[in-house]
Amino acid sequence: MFARLIRYFQEARAELARVTWPTREQVVEGTQAILLFTLAFMVILGLYDTVFRFLIGLLR
């Protein structure tokens, strides 16, 4: 039982050693892209919300 568990962790460690990890610059660029997309999406949704709230207000 413990031999299988030990083998599992050894294989997992070996697999992680083969991973090509991103550089710090790549992580920063990816994070900036995600933040920019999120901000743009928030603005678009906010504008839609404002327009629809105004239009629904006209119906009342």
Curated annotation (Swiss-Prot):
One of its GO terms (cellular component) is plasma membrane. The chain crosses the membrane at residues 32-52. It is a single-pass membrane protein. Residues 53-60 are extracellular. Residues 1-31 are cytoplasmic. GO terms for molecular function: protein transmembrane transporter activity. Pfam families: SecE. Its main location: membrane. It is found in: Cell inner membrane. GO terms for biological process: intracellular protein transmembrane transport; protein secretion; protein targeting; protein transport by the Sec complex. Keywords: Cell inner membrane, Cell membrane, Membrane, Protein transport, Translocation, Transmembrane, Transmembrane helix, Transport. Essential subunit of the protein translocation channel SecYEG. Clamps together the 2 halves of SecY. May contact the channel plug during translocation. Component of the Sec protein translocase complex. Heterotrimer consisting of SecY, SecE and SecG subunits. The heterotrimers can form oligomers, although 1 heterotrimer is thought to be able to translocate proteins. Interacts with SecDF, and other proteins may be involved. The channel interacts with SecA via subunit SecY. Belongs to the SecE/SEC61-gamma family. This is Protein translocase subunit SecE. It comes from Thermus thermophilus (strain ATCC 27634 / DSM 579 / HB8). The gene is secE.
